[in-house]
Amino acid sequence: DRAFLNCQSLTELRLPAELETLGDRALCDCMGLTSLTVPDGVRELPDLVFSGCVSLTSLTLPAGLTSIGRGAFCSCRSLTEVTIPDSVQFIGETAFADMPCLQTIHVGADNSAYKTVDGVLLTKAGDVLLAYPTTRPGIRYDVPDGVTRIGELAFYGSGLMIVRFPQSLRTVGDEAFEDSTLLVA
């Protein structure tokens, strides 16, 4: 755990191909890190593993990854896109919060647990909205019918001004619209 925590001057890191485990907050607040490839043997990204890597612009996740922990990419302020492998079966809430450059999240069609609709991350069943990319174009968003829950910090920092909620919505997570420009919901 916390192997490289707060190594602010670390700009490059080559993780060994044999690596299988990253500890909680292993690279948290490595503010100078710009790119990273997670080795193929890593199956789980723990909570806050890359949180605060504000200069990270390129990230490659392994095809066999199964779990992305809570806040794993929180405050990765320079990432513009994230591609979630088909093998991922769990994504913790706030995994993609406070990412002001995030334009889109990609999920492969063969992922059985998650999907994206116009770059917005939802469970495959479409009942939970987990993350809305901060810089997604437009000032209005209609939450898809069938969504019953909006995750914690899901719309953090969005430039949306208008959000329409479906009749199906039952729960809005903590601080779901924190630091957004929302005027009408």
Model-predicted regions and their roles:
Residues 7-21, 31-44, 54-67, 76-90, ...:
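Structural signature of tandem-repeat unit edges
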